Design a protein with these regions (language model features):
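Catalytic cores of DNA base-excision repair glycosylases
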Residues: 2-215
């Protein structure tokens, strides 16, 4: 298969396998999604969904969140890991949202990326899942699968995002991002598959004999 043929096959396969793409992180509005995505760095969605009800019971909007201390926020979110850094980001971005945006989450990628603790991937998730704007958030998991499936030879998530956006129609980006995540968690895991055993890897590369190592910069 050519790269385009692999992309077309993957697109059709995942769309049939996962016709529904529920957002994994529990939230009620763009702000609570933003906070949940920030908490999900190096943490499972399951754990985040266990912690956010406790946090949002204290504060579920930037006005009340900015009235809490960083210490209180950190204590609640500690099970998510990186509590000092994440609590600082949540506290400071909440203050900025109150001061500069009247408590609203901006709908522009560049403005989201300028918020404390918000990187390109987090901003892309919010654009996609809160506002429905086409985006293709790429984390280390999607980066790994894209390499296993021969969709990119890039050594970083930035290059992989660029390559995936070129291969797939823009109207599929938001759903496909989630479908890849769902498939990776269920079948093409980091250690169990290694590019050899899941149905997609076997179909795309039937003659592959050795584990596919992820290129990293």
């Amino acid at each position: 298969m050519t790269k385009k043929e692999r992309a077309a096959y993957i697109d059709e396969y995942l769309n049939e396998k996962y016709p529904e793409t529920p957002i994994p992180l529990d939230h009620k509005d763009p702000y609570t999604l933003l906070v949940a995505v920030l908490l999900s760095a190096q943490c499972t969605d399951i754990r985040v969904n266990q912690i956010t009800p406790k946090l949002f019971a204290k504060a579920d909007n930037p006005f009340t969140m900015s009235q809490l201390s960083q210490e209180i926020i950190a204590d609640i979110i500690r099970p998510c890991g990186l509590a000092p850094m994440k609590s600082k980001g949540i506290f400071n971005l909440s203050k900025i949202l109150v001061k500069e945006y009247n408590g609203e989450v901006p709908k522009q990628l560049e403005l989201l990326e300028a918020l404390p603790g918000v990187g390109h991937k987090t901003a892309s998730v919010v654009m996609s899942q809160a506002f429905g704007v086409p985006a293709f958030p790429v984390d280390t998991h999607i980066h790994r699968l894209a390499q296993r499936w021969g969709l990119t030879s890039g050594k970083n998530v930035q290059t992989t995002e660029r390559d995936l956006k070129r291969l797939f129609p823009e109207e599929r980006w938001n759903e496909l991002h989630l479908q890849i995540i769902f498939y990776g968690r269920e079948f093409c895991t980091a250690r169990a598959c290694q590019g050899l055993t899941c149905e997609l890897c076997r179909t795309l590369y039937p003659n592959r004999k050795h584990p596919k190592k992820t290129k990293k910069s």
